[in-house]
Swiss-Prot record:
It catalyses: (R)-pantothenate + ATP = (R)-4'-phosphopantothenate + ADP + H(+). GO terms for biological process: coenzyme A biosynthetic process. This is Type II pantothenate kinase. Its EC number is 2.7.1.33. It comes from Staphylococcus aureus (strain NCTC 8325 / PS 47). The keyword Cell membrane does not apply. The keyword Glycoprotein does not apply. Keywords: ATP-binding, Coenzyme A biosynthesis, Cytoplasm, Kinase, Nucleotide-binding, Transferase. ATP binds at residues 6-13, 99, 121-125, 137, 225. Not regulated by feedback inhibition by CoA and its thioesters as described for many other pantothenate kinases. Competitively inhibited by N-pentylpantothenamide (N5-Pan) and N-heptylpantothenamide (N7-Pan), although these compounds can also act as substrates, being converted to inactive CoA analogs which inhibit a number of cellular targets, especially fatty acid biosynthesis. The active site is at E70.
Length: 267
């Protein structure tokens, strides 16, 4: 069995390959000791690690492991997944939306990191908790699906009420900028959480589009664990990307790009 692991700040993504079959699983990074214990009990032919906590795992296992730079691993794995899923892209920006967000340009041969922001799944969980007292990510995202941002976010159409706006009316003029105009409204936890996911999605997308224009590509690939069980984030990102004139792409199991890529990088 071959095992690739992307040990991130919040989640550990694990890919196992055996008999041309691939299996995926995740574990919370706070349970890294359990992952180490599991690894030490397996018959592993090849173990490859990436991510910020790769060194912690390598120091505590009784089998040899190779460690790779997470950006290179993610790019390698994403290329494999894109090909397997029928996406033939000459070049693209990819946004890896994990705890934070890392932005990369792939020119058809290699990747280069072109930016990063602190907005991502960590903000959804942290700010989401402050607004709702909910700690479970799935519960947060499930609740957000039913939310309405209309009384929270100020849209361009809210400003240009009786005239044609110079930019699309559905663009957000100010996240949370409509709140003071609706002080008598019932700001439910669902509405507040939907607004949090909205600002995360729009900031990530805006940054991705900015670098896409800089590198003259219209293709943006979104990956990362923040999209897991988060249809609203995916919709926000997809709609906003199209609205701004670019093409969004998602890949199944994209959050495991780093773990897959580590298996196929060679030292």
């Amino acid at each position: 069995m071959k095992v690739g692991i992307d040990a991130g700040g919040t989640l550990i993504k694990i890919v196992q390959e055996q008999d041309n079959q691939r299996t995926f699983k995740t574990e919370l990074t706070k349970n890294i000791d359990q992952v180490v214990e599991w690894l030490n009990q397996q018959q592993i032919e090849k173990l490859c690690l990436t991510g910020g906590n790769a060194g912690v795992i390598a120091e505590n296992i009784n089998i040899p492991a190779q460690i790779f730079v997470e950006f290179d691993a993610a790019s390698q794995g994403l290329g494999i997944l894109l090909k397997e899923q029928g996406h033939d892209l000459a070049d693209y920006i990819f946004a890896n939306v994990g705890t934070g967000t890392s932005l990369h340009y792939f020119d058809g041969q290699s990747q280069r990191r072109v930016g990063g922001i602190g907005t991502g799944g960590g903000m959804i969980q942290g700010l989401g908790y402050l607004l709702s007292q909910i700690t479970d990510y799935k519960q947060l995202t499930d609740m957000a699906q039913h939310g309405d941002r209309n009384t929270i976010d100020l849209k361009v159409r809210h400003i240009y009420k009786d005239t044609e706006p110079p930019i699309p009316g559905d663009l957000t003029a100010a996240n949370f900028g409509h709140v003071l105009h609706h002080l008598d409204a019932d700001f439910t936890p669902s509405n507040k959480l939907a607004a949090v996911i909205g600002v995360v999605g729009e900031v990530v997308t805006t940054m991705a589009i900015t670098v896409a224009r800089e590198f003259k590509t219209e293709n943006i690939v979104y990956i990362g664990s923040s999209f897991h069980n988060n249809a609203l984030l995916r919709k926000v990102v997809e709609d906003y990307t199209v609205l701004r004139g670019c093409k969004p792409y998602y890949v199944e199991n994209g959050a495991f790009s780093g773990a897959i890529g580590a298996l196929y990088l060679e030292k």
